Amino acid sequence: MAKFKYKTQMYQNLYANIKNIYSECAQAAKEIGIADELVKLKEEGRGTFGLTGGVSGCPAPLRDDVLAFSEKEAKSVKGLAGYVEEIRYMVKDFYGSDYDACPVNTCEAGINVCYTSMFMPPVMGAGDTYRARYIAPYEKHFHHQGGYGRPFPPKYKDIIANRGCTAGELGMQGKRQPMLDVLVTKLEGADYSNHGIQYFPATMLSGVKGEANRAVFEEQAARHATMFSGITSIGYDTPGYGYGDKDADGTPILQKVLADVAHKYDVPYVVDAAWCLPFVGHDIRKTGADAIVYSLDKASASSICGMIIGKEDIMVNARRAMGFHGNRYGSLSSYGKAVSVAFDPGKEGLCGAIAAMRVLKDKPEIMTKPVDAMYDIIVEEFKKGIAPELLKGFTFTKTYGSCACEINYEHTWDNGQMGIPIFSIEDMYGGTNIFQEGIGAMGMIPTIAYDGNIYVSTGLNTLDDTGALIPERMRLAIRGLIALINITCKYAGIMD
């Protein structure tokens, strides 16, 4: 395959050969044994399998314990406020009495509740409403945590324009809150080079150091002090997400820095931890965050439900917004009839959350043990399947906090050389992310694989009904991923 002078030429050639790549992927699936495994799963009525845990558009099968509790409670007549209270006291048992909980129907709903009740300026009262601005690092998944304000500076006005299935007011634009701006803040040590078939800036963050960014956020906060209302970030803990620089306790230093800056100005620091586990992952006590939002149907293996956990004082805002904080006549708990009542999770979501959180709190090894086995399979298969000169640019990071293994290949581009193709998140939404669509061509469910970072996790029929890893099936999935990388590299001109 021809070598290319410019990376734009490489991505153009990939696009021109996309059908050939997917055809070779389908053939590889047969040779590896993926196709045969898919036949077995379909005969069992279990659909397909994949490289990820449950996602919004494809929830994971429920474990036996979650399913059993949900089925039992489905036949019980109880007020939903009682379930909310049980969740509340699990959180207090683990984090301490100064913390509280607020269940919601999805993680995105939780972010909406937090930003509306904690970042957005008040809209009641005579006269004009003032503007407020929250700080968001320019990092991965920015369209979630960074999508609720008008971007500042204006050069970022289209930063999330191509990140959604629906354009305009009912798509990403519709998340923007009244009189709220988002301060897009580049990270020191990050690489925002353009990549992908859609050729947008990628967020490559393995070089980010926590303390090196303190001055960046201090300056941003000081510059906008009169309108500064909060800080947000994601809650992951791996190098590819910019949080590989940690203290002696394993806490990402950048998250502690963000908390310090927020508290200096007496504004909240809210963490989007969609793919993290409460009790196991991001520890709000160590980072200093004020509130953290989870998607329990992802890594936590619950039915569809979101969860806000935070410090009691700021959680009054969220719980009142959801109608959980008690009736006006003095009750200690209630359910619904507040501004964000449309975000309530319902009985099925609450029961799944309770069952999943019990395991995370009391038997976390059920969730973490499969991660060890998955990591070993990934490292073993990549050593066998990826050319040594390319493998030098990979890093593999295991994270219990997300039940995942991060496969980062940013450094295959070191020293000015052409590396393994990097696809942007715009490629994902545009259907041109070959590292995701190619897995689909093999018949499997892909995982997020953009910005030089592939996040493999357990869940989509790679665990049995008790939550134990099915190693043979996970190995097939990883071999499929490696085959896809090699096929793509051939058409990228970086290997024969």
What residue ranges belong to the model's regions?
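N-terminal "arm"/small-domain region of PLP-dependent enzymes with the aminotransferase-like
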Residues: 1-81, 96-97, 441-462, 468
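Conserved PLP-enzyme active-site core in the AAT-like
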Residues: 2, 7, 11, 77, ...
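Conserved C-terminal alpha-helix-loop-beta "cap" of PLP-dependent enzymes
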Residues: 2-19, 23-24, 376-493
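Short charge-dense sequence patches
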Residues: 26-42, 57-66, 201-203, 266-273, ...
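Short secondary-structure transition/capping segments
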Residues: 36-38, 43-52, 126, 151-152, ...
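Short N-terminal helix-initiation segments at or just after the protein's N-terminus
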Residues: 40-44, 70-76, 230, 288-290, ...
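Structural motif of enzymes handling amino- and sulfur-group chemistry
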Residues: 60-61, 333-419
